[in-house]
C-alpha cells in the first residue's frame, strides 16, 4: 500500500507526525493501516519496509494487547447510572477487530448489544485519555493512542486540543476516521491527514477468493459492485442470508403505483428498526439506483448483480424513470440518511422520503 510505505519513510526520516489522522470511506482499509502502523511502532525487529510480525511486540500489538497501546472508540453506557467509556469494552473491541478488521461502527455497536443506541466518545473519556498519556510508558518506549472514529467526539473533542498540540514525550496519536466533515476543525488543523482512496476491484476479488467467500466470476462481480469498499463486498456476500431486495421491490411498487397506504406502512415498519439498520437499507437502495444510472450507458445484461436485482435495475434504467429522476432519487435518499444520522425523527423522515420519491417518479413538483 502506497500510504503505508510513505508513512514508514516518514518514520525513518524522523518526521512521523505525533498526531496522525487516517481518513477513508467505509471499507477502504483505514483501520487495518492504522493497526499495521501500531504494530510497526512496537516491533522489536522492524526493517525499513515492515514489521517482523513475529516478535513479542508485534504479536501483542496485533491483538491490541500491548501495555503502551491505549484505545478509544464509540461506546455506550454498560448499565444505568454509568457513563460510556471505552475501558468497559476493551476485550469486546479486541474480539471485534480480530473478527472484522473492516467492520463498521454499526457492526461494532451491534457487537456490544447497543440496539438503537448511538455510540459516543465522552468528555470523561477525553479527560481519562489525557491522564493516561501523561503517565510514564510501561515498557520505556513509545506510547500510542489509537482512536477509532473521532467523529463521535463532538464538541467534547476540544478537551484534547492541548494534548494533541503538545503531547508528552514519546507519545503518538493515531486517529481513524471516515467523515472529515464531522470532525471538529480545531482537531483537524492539529493533525496530519492521510486520505485513502478506494480499493481496486482486482484487489477486492483476490481478497474474497483468498477468504473462500466467493470465487471466479462471482468474486469479480461482487468486487465490481462494491465500488472500492471491502466492507461493501462483505455485505454483498452476506446478502444471500439477509435479503433486503424484497423490501426494496415492495417500496418501489408503492412508489410507482402512488400507494400512500403502503408508503405509510413502510415508514412505520422501518421506523422500528435501529438507525444503523435504516441507513444500511437506504444505502442499499442508493446502490441499486446508481447501478441503474450506470446501466443507461452499458449493454443489456452487463449489470453485475444477481438476476432479480439485475432485472429490477434494467427496468429502472429503461424508460420507466428518467435519468434526471434517478439522480434526484439518489440525492433525496442521501439527504434522508443525513438527517437520520443526526437523530431526526425516523418515521417522519422515511414517510417524507416515500412521498418525495413518488413526486420525483411521477414528474411532479413538491409543494413548498
Language-model segments: residues:
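Residues immediately C-terminal
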Residues: 152, 166, 182
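Conserved catalytic/switch belt of AAA+ P-loop NTPases
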Residues: 134, 158-169
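Clamp-loader machinery-focused feature within the broader ASCE/P-loop NTPase space
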Residues: 1-155
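Charged, glycine-rich active-site and insertion segments that engage polyanionic ligands
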Residues: 1-42, 46-49, 53-60, 169-172, ...
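Conserved adenine-binding aromatic site and its adjacent loop/helix in ATP-hydrolyzing domains
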Residues: 131, 162, 189
Amino acid at each position: 500500500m502506497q500510504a503505508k510505505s510513505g508513512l514508514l519513510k516518514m518514520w525513518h526520516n524522523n518526521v512521523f507526525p505525533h498526531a496522525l489522522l487516517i481518513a477513508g470511506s467505509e471499507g477502504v482499509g483505514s483501520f487495518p493501516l492504522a493497526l499495521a502502523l501500531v504494530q510497526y511502532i512496537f516491533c522489536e525487529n522492524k526493517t525499513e519496509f515492515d514489521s517482523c510480525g513475529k516478535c513479542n511486540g508485534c504479536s501483542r500489538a496485533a491483538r491490541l494487547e500491548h501495555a503502551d497501546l491505549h484505545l478509544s472508540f464509540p461506546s455506550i453506557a454498560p448499565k444505568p447510572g454509568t457513563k460510556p467509556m471505552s475501558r468497559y469494552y476493551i476485550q469486546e473491541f479486541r474480539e471485534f477487530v480480530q473478527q472484522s478488521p473492516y467492520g463498521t461502527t454499526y457492526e461494532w455497536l451491534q457487537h456490544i448489544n447497543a440496539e438503537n443506541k448511538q455510540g459516543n466518545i465522552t468528555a470523561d473519556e477525553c479527560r481519562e485519555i489525557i491522564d493516561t498519556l501523561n503517565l510514564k510508558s510501561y515498557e520505556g518506549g513509545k506510547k500510542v493512542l489509537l482512536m477509532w472514529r473521532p467523529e463521535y467526539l463532538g464538541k467534547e473533542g476540544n478537551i484534547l486540543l492541548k494534548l494533541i498540540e503538545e503531547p508528552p514525550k514519546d507519545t503518538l496519536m493515531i486517529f481513524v476516521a471516515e467523515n472529515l466533515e464531522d470532525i471538529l476543525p480545531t482537531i483537524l488543523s492539529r493533525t496530519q491527514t492521510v486520505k485513502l482512496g478506494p480499493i481496486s476491484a482486482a484487489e477486492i476479488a483476490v481478497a474474497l477468493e483468498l477468504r473462500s467467500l466467493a470465487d471466479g466470476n462471482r468474486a469479480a462481480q461482487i468486487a465490481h459492485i462494491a465500488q472500492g469498499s471491502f466492507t461493501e463486498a462483505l455485505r454483498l456476500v452476506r446478502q444471500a442470508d439477509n435479503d433486503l431486495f424484497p423490501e426494496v421491490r415492495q417500496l418501489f411498487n408503492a412508489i410507482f403505483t402512488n400507494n400512500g397506504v403502503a408508503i405509510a406502512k413502510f415508514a412505520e415498519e422501518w421506523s422500528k428498526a435501529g438507525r444503523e439498520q435504516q441507513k444500511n437499507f437506504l444505502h442499499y437502495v442508493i446502490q441499486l439506483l446508481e447501478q441503474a444510472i450506470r446501466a443507461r450507458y452499458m449493454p443489456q445484461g452487463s449489470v453485475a448483480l444477481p438476476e432479480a436485482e439485475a432485472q429490477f435495475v434494467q427496468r429502472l434504467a429503461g424508460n420507466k424513470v428518467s435519468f434526471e429522476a434517478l439522480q434526484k432519487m439518489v440525492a433525496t435518499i442521501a439527504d434522508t440518511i443525513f438527517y437520520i444520522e443526526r437523530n431526526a425523527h425516523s418515521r417522519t423522515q422515511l414517510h417524507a422520503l416515500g412521498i418525495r420519491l413518488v413526486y420525483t417518479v411521477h414528474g411532479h413538483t413538491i409543494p413548498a
